[in-house]
Amino acid sequence: MAKRATQACAAIFALAFLVTGVVYVLFGSCPATNADFWSIYEFYFSHSWWQTAVQKYADHSLFFPNFFWLASVKFFHGSQVPLNLIGLALLFTTAALLLLLVWRDETTGRTMKIVATMVVIVGNFWMGREAITCFGGFNSENSLTMAAAALCFVLIRGTSRLWLMILIIIGAGFVSSFSCGQGFAIWPTLLLLAWCLRFRWPAIVAIGVGTLVAIITYQLLPPLSEDYRVIQAANSGGITLVAHLCRLISSPVLYAAAAWTGIRMNEYSSVNQASTLALWTGAVGLVLAGVILIRRVVRRDLGKSSLEIAGLGLVVFNVGAVMLIIAGRIQYFHMLPSEVLAPRYLFWSSLFWTGLFLVAIQRAEHQRWGRWTAIVFALAAVIFAWPEHYLMWFHNKLSKCRVEQAATAVINGVVDDNSWFLSLDPRQIGRVAPQLRAHRLDMFADGLQDWIGLNETSLFRGRRKPEDLRGKCRVSKLVECDNGAPAARVVGLATTRHHVPRVVRWAIAPVTWIVGKEIKKGYVTPARFVIVDPTGVVRGVARSCSLTPIVNRVFYQGRFPTTDFLGYIRDYNPQVQYVVRSAADDVLSEETIPVQDDASNNPQL
């Protein structure tokens, strides 16, 4: 009875994390180019596709995932949707390969395998990793790195005499290494696993040669490395490096604890108790990993359990990945210590704990008291991780809306202070955006920028129809165009009449019963608007955040406003009366919403 209850609980937890993780990654995925990809675009517009692929960006070789990005530019106008789907598919691939090792294991029973399955799913689909998994470009890089590493773990067992498999493993190591800088951690991981699996010396030497070839190839890729940050990191002080390592490893625990306390992470991490928790938790995890690793290195008896291969591989690989992060960012960590706990590093540190739990589950299977201890700790860890997982549902959706608003400013050719949601360097946006506009890529693919300056009668062949458009809007801030001309930010509320089809209402009825939110006839906000002057000339466009009332009620508990929109007016003249029309479904609304001039007060919308 206890076994069945344990299996049921583990299966329910795994399903809950899997379903919610996938749903909220899809709904919260970043819709526009952001962060480092502005640098890649800037390089791409002045070089060939091959030069773009082999170039190192921020000391990362992105050779293999760059082909995903180049394909998106070539065939999908730079849309983020293909990258989001590829990243999610690679995330599934990583989890599937690890689960293959779990269920191929012959040393554990069904109950422990189900618990291990729960651990793998939570480790991969925990929304604490949303800083990577909700950004298609980053997810495709990092998940390809992990998927290649997981493939190595699957193939490495019992292949010491199969040279074809050895070559495939080395090839997967190259894919991991040249997908993301942290992927170079695969080589010490492979060497250690090969030793513990009692590989013959020719196979170990072959992996060692692959390691040297990968390092030399990396050094030869442009731009050539001149600062040798690994050596600089080694000279920065052992105690400092160990402290950074402990904090990075413990960051999932710290984020989960902050979610339970209800305090924001940037405030919680500054508390002395939190700093102590980070150091000691990381130290305990590393000591446990070290004890397990030393035991396996001495005994060289790893080949009996594929589950332990997966766990030990994850532990060693992600410790190596974190050490590479420290080596590359050591100077930045000195200047800004809080950067050590940046959420993007949770992608790696969470998998360290996943691997540690997998090893513990395998080792506890045949211990008298260890079995139930491991089960209780695994279930407790999953419950402990849930609040952060839950809170990130809302955080990543809010981030998506902020990115869409910043992209609206770029479409209108306006310089606003929300540009940092796209890039920390606004000047880079100013350099790259004209090229994106010229090639109709990314946020310019829909052609909204072409409407500005046209007469409204020339849009959609002059088609208009009653939409029952209602709302209000006002000028919230005066800004500037990219050419220095005056501009204005417009924020508002707008709705049009919309009836939910009966078939759709029937289909979602079971979900609405669960969440307690009835879907009724009501209004929706159009996705696009035009802002016109008295002569009928379009002076700017506006967009709403892509969140329907149904999705908001069912998946976000109605917490987000679904009627807001944001836009800009180019060449703004406060003496002119502007109006807003909806421009959804290739038709303009007959109704208009007047723009109120209230730049001195921010509207509460």
Description of each model-found segment:
Residues V73, A95, L99-W103, A149-G158, ...:
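Hydrophobic transmembrane alpha-helices
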Residues T548-Y568:
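Aromatic sugar-binding surface patches on proteins
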Residues C30-S48, F135-N139, Q219-L254, A310, ...:
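Extracytoplasmic catalytic-loop and juxtamembrane helix elements of membrane-embedded
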Residues F17, A116-V122, G208-I215, L302-Q331:
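Transmembrane alpha-helix segments characteristic
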Residues T6-H60, W69, V73-V120, L192-A194, ...:
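Intrinsically disordered, polar/acidic, low-complexity terminal segments
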Residues L164-S179, I186-W195:
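Membrane-interface alpha helices of multi-pass inner-membrane proteins
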Residues F529, N573-A584:
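Short, aromatic- and glycine-rich surface loops/edge beta-strands on solvent-exposed regions
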Residues D36, L62, M112-S160, F178-G183, ...:
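Membrane-interface micro-motifs in multi-pass membrane enzymes
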